[in-house]
Amino acid sequence: MASGILLNVKEEVTCPICLELLTEPLSLHCGHSFCQACITANHKKSMLYKEGERSCPVCRISYQPENIQPNRHVANIVEKLREVKLSPEEGQKVDHCARHGEKLLLFCQEDSKVICWLCERSQEHRGHHTFLMEEVAQEYHVKLQTALEMLRQKQQEAEKLEADIREEKASWKIQIDHDKTNVLADFEQLREILDREESNELQNLEKEKEDILKSLTKSETKMVQQTQYVRELISDLEHRLQGSMMELLQGVDGIIKRIENMTLKKPKTFHKNQRRVFRAPDLKGMLDMFRELTDARRYWVDVTLAPNNISHAVIAEDKRQVSSRNPQIVYQSPGTLFQSLTNFNYCTGVLGSQSITSGKHYWEVDVSKKSAWILGVCAGFQSDAMCNIEQNENYQPKYGYWVIGLQEGVKYSVFQDGSLHTPFAPFIVPLSVIICPDRVGVFVDYEACTVSFFNITNHGFLIYKFSQCSFSKPVFPYLNPRKCTVPMTLCSPSS
C-alpha cells in the first residue's frame, strides 16, 4: 500500500514534459508544474512558431512569463521523495522500472542502461539507440567474458608482483640481519683484540712490578744491615770515649782502620726514564686493517678449482679441495726453508677455474692442520712443462707467482724476486706470524696491482702485501698442498 501511495505522489511531482521528477519546479497560473529547464525550452519554442503566444503544455491555457512562480512546496516534496527507499519487496522487483513501473525490456546503448518503453520516449533517452535486451545480451556476454579473462591475467600479474615484493622484503630482512650478525661478530673480534692486549699489558706490568719490588726488597734488607752495622760502630766509639784510658786504647788502631776502610754500599736502583713505557695498541692501525679486510670481503668470489691431469694432485668432486697424492719428497737441505723444492711441488700446484683480468677479487682458503702449503695467485702454467722443472726458480713475481707458504709447520715465508747474484732462485723472506692461520684470505686488486694475504684466524691481520705487481696477462688463484696430505679447501662466501 505504501508503494502505491509513493507511486501516486511520484506522478504528481513528475514533469509532464521530461517525465522525470521535477527539477527546480516552476508553477503556471493554471496550477501545472514543470522543470525550469523544460518550461523555458517550451517557452522559446512557442515564441518561434506561435508569434509570442505562450500556453501551458498540458491544458493549453495561456500564461505570462511574469506569472511563473517557483513552487518550493513541490520542490520539498521531490527532495523528500528522492530520500525515500522502497520496501524490500519493492526492491526485489528488479525487472520493473523504478520510475514508471513498466517492465524493463530495452537497453540504451548511449547510457548503457536497461530501460522501459516509457523511459525510451522520455527526454533523457530521446534520439538514443535502443535495443531489445535479447538482441544485445550475447554480444555483451562475450565482451564481459573477455574482460573477465583480462582481469584474471591482471590478477595473476598482481599476485606475482605481490609475491615478488614479499620475496624482496624477506630477502632484505635476511640480508640486513646477516649484516647485523657480521657487525656484531666483527666488533666482538675487536673487543677480543682489545681485551687480549689489555690482559697482556697488565701481565707485563705486574711482572715488572714483581721483579723490581723483589730486587728493591733485597737491597732494602742489605741497607738495613749496613745501617745497623754503622750504629754498632758508633755505639762502640761512644763507649770508648766515655770509658777509662785502658778501654779507650785497647784495639784502637783496628777500630780506626775499620772505620777508614768502610765503604757504604749503594742499593741497586731502577731509572724510571729507562723502564718500558706503556703505549696503547695502535687502534687506528687495527681499525684501518679491519676496514681493509671488511672492504675486501665485499668482493668475495666463489672460486673453484680447474680440472687438471697432474698425477700428484687430487681434486675433490666439488672442485673446492685439493690434496697431495704422494707425500714422499726429498730435500737437499732439510733445515733450509723452500731451498730445494723438487718438481713434486709443481706437480701438486693447481689453479682456480676463474681467470682475473680486472676488478677486485677475494677468496679464503682453509689450511687448518696442514704443515706445508703454498697459496696466492699465478699467471698460469702448463702442467707438463712444470713437472720437468727441478728447482723452485719459478716461484717469483717476475715469473707470474705472487705466493706465500708454510714449511715444517711453523715457518712462514714469502717468495720475492731473486737478487742479481742469484737471479734464478727466489729471495725467500721469513714472515712473522704470531698466531698460525687456519684460514687465509687472498685479495687481488687488478687495477691497483696488489695482492694481499690476511690471517682470518687472527682477526684478519695482514700477513703480507705484494705491491706494484706486473699483471701483464690474466692471473688465477693458485693452491699447492705440497707434501702434506691434509687437504686445502676453498671456502664458500657463505661460510
From Swiss-Prot:
Phosphoserine modifications at: S87
InterPro entries: B30.2/SPRY, B30.2/SPRY_sf, Butyrophylin_SPRY, ConA-like_dom_sf, SPRY_dom, TRIM/RBCC, Znf-RING_euk, Znf_B-box
Catalytic reactions of this protein: S-ubiquitinyl-[E2 ubiquitin-conjugating enzyme]-L-cysteine + [acceptor protein]-L-lysine = [E2 ubiquitin-conjugating enzyme]-L-cysteine + N(6)-ubiquitinyl-[acceptor protein]-L-lysine
Enzyme Commission number(s): 2.3.2.27
Annotated zinc fingers (RING-type), start-end: 15-60
GO biological process annotation, one example: positive regulation of MAPK cascade
GO annotations of cellular component type: nucleus; P-body
Residue intervals of the B30.2/SPRY domain: 283-495
Post-translational modification: Degraded in a proteasome-independent fashion in the absence of viral infection but in a proteasome-dependent fashion following exposure to restriction sensitive virus.
Pfam families xrefs: SPRY, zf-B_box, zf-RING_UBOX
Keywords from the named record: Acetylation, Antiviral defense, Autophagy, Coiled coil, Cytoplasm, Immunity, Innate immunity, Metal-binding, Nucleus, Phosphoprotein, Transferase, Ubl conjugation, Ubl conjugation pathway, Zinc, Zinc-finger
Comment, domains: The B box-type zinc finger domain and the coiled-coil domain contribute to the higher and low order multimerization respectively which is essential for restriction activity. The coiled coil domain is important for higher order multimerization by promoting the initial dimerization. The B30.2/SPRY domain acts as a capsid recognition domain. Polymorphisms in this domain explain the observed species-specific differences among orthologs.
Chain's role: Capsid-specific restriction factor that prevents infection from non-host-adapted retroviruses. Blocks viral replication early in the life cycle, after viral entry but before reverse transcription. In addition to acting as a capsid-specific restriction factor, also acts as a pattern recognition receptor that activates innate immune signaling in response to the retroviral capsid lattice.
Annotated family: Belongs to the TRIM/RBCC family.
Protein name per the record: Tripartite motif-containing protein 5
Species for this entry: Macaca fascicularis
Taxonomic classification: Eukaryota, Metazoa, Chordata, Craniata, Vertebrata
Name of the coding gene: TRIM5
